[in-house]
Amino acid sequence: MNPDSNRFKQLESLAKKLGQAWTENTMIEGPDDFEIPHSREEAYFVQDHMAKFIGKDISGWKVGATSAKMRELDGHDDVIPGRIFSPVTFLGPIQKLHINQFPNARVETEFAFRLNEDIPIRDQNWTVSDMENIVS
């Protein structure tokens, strides 16, 4: 995406606000109307620039809006991928998480898995038996 310089500054402003809120564990005021992305492409632009501002290693990716009903309710036309940063990745059976690290947190079910090898694109669908040794 190559926004004009004015639009770039508007989207970059939102990315910086979001990145700063992430690093400081704070909330932002609602974005200014002119900062709101007008398309999926602009939203990914903000997400990419927010990640640059945060500057932390990526430990994985998450996918939101995975059900058709959720996409319908939220007005999305596809799933929504997002980065998971290493400072908020917790490994092991016992972890102590401080609630102030997650302002206005809500409980939500998450499923995680690890890809043990690359999964190439192919013409036929992957089956459970195909994936058993690839995913852990």
List each language-model region with its residue ranges.
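Active-site microenvironments in enzyme catalytic cores
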Residues: 3-136
